[in-house]
């Protein structure tokens, strides 16, 4: 009876120690692998060429939840270059209903990040057609079309409405890595 009790005790200790070690290893490596998973999702999105699929991953920590979403938008022909375009949306917050969105339009040339337009939020619907970038704002119910034939501008100004005498709207910045 003493041998059976001793074996059960050793087994339980082994399981507890084994679980603690694997959990701590996962947590230590979690911060290193977030960027790796983001890069893999970007690659999948670029290779899919399917604008009806959204690739996403949710990462939870003790006090924060981050949702990363990638959607293929299409390709832009600017001069002789053919840019692949994806939308990156990062929802971040302590709770699901209090998350804030950071949306960017990312341009890739020959599989490498060329640059991105930042400053967008969750109120924008983005559409790509040949050499045009079309933005629609759900909140203001306004739309703008940007023709990108010759070059990529450093700033895009999105007016809230055309009838307003004051220039009110959003500015999106183009950042290069």
Describe the function of each predicted region:
Residues 1-6:
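Positively charged n-region of N-terminal signal peptides that target proteins for export
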Residues 15-18:
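C-terminal motif of bacterial Sec signal peptides marking the signal peptidase cleavage site
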Residues 20-56, 127-177:
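Acidic, small-residue rich beta-repeat scaffolds with periodic aromatic anchors
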Residues 41-122:
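Surface-exposed acidic loop/strand-edge motifs in secreted or periplasmic proteins
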């Amino acid at each position: 009876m003493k041998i059976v009790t001793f074996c059960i005790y050793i087994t339980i200790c082994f399981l507890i120690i084994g679980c603690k070690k694997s959990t701590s290893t996962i947590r230590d490596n979690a911060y290193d692998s977030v960027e790796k998973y983001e890069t893999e999702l970007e690659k999948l999105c670029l290779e899919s060429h399917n604008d009806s699929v959204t690739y996403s991953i949710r990462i939870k920590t003790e006090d924060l939840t981050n949702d990363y979403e990638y959607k293929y938008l299409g390709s832009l022909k600017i001069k002789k270059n053919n840019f692949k375009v994806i939308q990156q949306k990062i929802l971040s917050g302590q709770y699901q209903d209090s998350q804030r969105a950071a949306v960017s339009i990312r341009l890739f040339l020959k599989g490498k990040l060329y640059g991105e337009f930042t400053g967008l939020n969750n109120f924008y619907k983005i559409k790509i057609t040949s050499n045009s970038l079309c933005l629609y704002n759900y909140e203001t119910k306004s739309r703008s079309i940007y023709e990108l034939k010759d070059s990529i501008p450093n700033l895009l100004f999105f007016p809230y409405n055309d009838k307003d005498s004051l220039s009110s709207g959003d500015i999106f910045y183009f950042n290069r890595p």
